[in-house]
From Swiss-Prot:
Gene Ontology terms describing biological process: rRNA processing
Identification of the protein by name: rRNA-processing protein cgrA
InterPro entries assigned: Cgr1-like (IPR005579)
Region Disordered, residue ranges: 1-96
General function of this protein: Involved in nucleolar integrity and required for processing of the pre-rRNA for the 60S ribosome subunit.
Biased composition, class Basic and acidic residues, residue ranges: 41-93
Keyword flag rRNA processing: yes
Gene behind the chain: cgrA
Cellular localization per UniProt: Nucleus, Nucleolus
Amino acid sequence: MSASESAPSAPPVKGMRKNGKNWHDSKKPFRPTAGMTSYAKRLEARKHQEAVKEHERELKEEKEAERQAHIQRIKDRRAAKEEKERYDKMAEKMHRKRVERLKRREKRNKLLNS
């Protein structure tokens, strides 16, 4: 009896299907890429991906820095233009020497405050 008990515990024969549809292929779990890449290859691909992302991040930061520098140049230019217009408006009302004296005083104050 021990021989008959050990027979059912053995795995079923590959050729015979349980439901009797032997003309169909036996079903297997659908894992097309499972186990195809080794751990070392996955690590290498991950490192490569990280390097690419880091490079992209650096490029983005560089581009953003250029953009901010451009914006700052525009702001500085506009501020200088406004200041010049203000001095011109003052020059219309006052004498030239007094305007120059005020300019110097404002520059001194600006340097002291900054």
